[in-house]
Amino acid sequence: MMVTGCLFLAVAARAEARPLLMISVDGLRPGDVLEADKRGLKIPVLRKLAADGMTASGVRNVLPTVTYPNHTTLITGVFPSRHGIAGNVTFDPKQQNMDSWYWYARDIKVKTLWDAVHAHGGKVASLSWPVSVGAASIDYNIPEYWRAHNADDIKLVTALATPGLVDEMQKATGLALAKADGDTVEADTGRLRYAAALIAAHHPEFTTVHLRALDHVEHETGPGSKESNAALESLDRAIGETIAAARKATPDLAVAIVSDHGFSPVEHDVNLIAPFVQAGLITLDAKGKVTSWQAEPWGSASVAVVLANPKDEALKAKVAKLVKELAAKPELGIADVADESAIAKMGGTPMASFWIDFKPGYTMGADPSKPAVSPGTVKGNHGYFPTQPNMRATFILEGDGIAKKSLGEIDMRDVAPTLAKVMDVPFPGPDGKPLY
């Protein structure tokens, strides 16, 4: 009798858990939702979710404020210094790894929400989430991955996806994977249709979806441009259709709308590579490729400086002197320089001995032959220190039983434990805490 009662209580407690759909709109600034009228944005779906749910005025994200480290913090609740995803691209000063990104889940050094839900007996689904290739705890996975940026990439993604899943989604939606993979609004819309079909067919407890178009357009045309606004309005409609279809299949579905970072307009590229070459810290060949290095700047809107031998105090002193001299030149637009202690407080990778942050409007250029400062090659960027207000990300959580609440500004590390609580899943280990 006691055993039966305990089992009943366990089942009843589990029945209160809500399945969850987390949609990341890469590059979505919180003000685009909270100040939509002021910015001339017609996004009724996102506005209603924010009005009806738990909404942050902004999310303090992690160093660097780029896609892959922040998406990994969203599903782990820890800083990059703990989860191991240091940037978007891997550190590769000699460019021997063909511009490889941190695609592979095996590089995550801590437990994820995917792991927690799977271990608790729940099904997990994911579409184009960063750092998801080979994630064993994702039952239905079409990961984010590319190589040649041509049609063969679709074959690669299909091979890396859960066996049979791409064929199943293509048949269910009538959309070829080529129409649901990439960084266009069309691809994001297709990806959302896949998500709705997947939820209807398999009823996963946890689904993660990454939308890439807004970020892409903001880089090309700048944040708040008419093109960026048009992209967001299109995504708003597609998100609304997806939620409606998903809730038809799973009525108690909770929805989290998140982003990884904000955006800043860019006007200037800064050549940081040339001063390192002139100081004898980097050697380039005739084509401008690195042949040897002692210290390498790595990044864009903020720049990690990695030393070949960080225990070499003479080298560290030489680099510290150079960085100080660069920061003293106002034309370079350097806002701040962090040492190892400050980097550790912001949770950045311990690979970096120094970290240079640019002012809004400035970013590091990629061409060592260009002048010290030249016109920007992109119109918008992110990656600055998370202390910069325009880097704030978005968080909205909505669903039955979730209180309407203005959260103010939150820490990104609080997102994962909050979502674990929504799903009633044990999740030990995060640095953050539930928001309710």
Go through the PLM ranges and name each one.
Residues 20-24, 57-58, 73-75, 124-128, ...:
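Structural recognition of the beta-strand scaffold that forms the well-ordered cores
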Residues 79-222, 318:
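His/Asp/Glu-rich, glycine-adjacent segments
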Residues 278-320, 378-422:
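Substrate-binding rim/cap in mid-to-C-terminal beta-strand-loop elements of soluble/periplasmic
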Residues 25, 57, 64-66, 90-106, ...:
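Secreted, luminal/periplasmic, and some membrane-associated catalytic domains
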Residues 1-10:
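Bacterial N-terminal signal peptides
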Residues 32-33, 185-209, 214-256, 318-325, ...:
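A long, amphipathic alpha-helix that forms part
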Residues 15-54:
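Active-site-proximal N-terminal segment of extracellular/periplasmic enzymes that hydrolyze or transfer
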Residues 55-78, 127-137, 431-435:
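Short, solvent-exposed turn/loop segments enriched in Gly/Ser/Thr/Pro and often Arg
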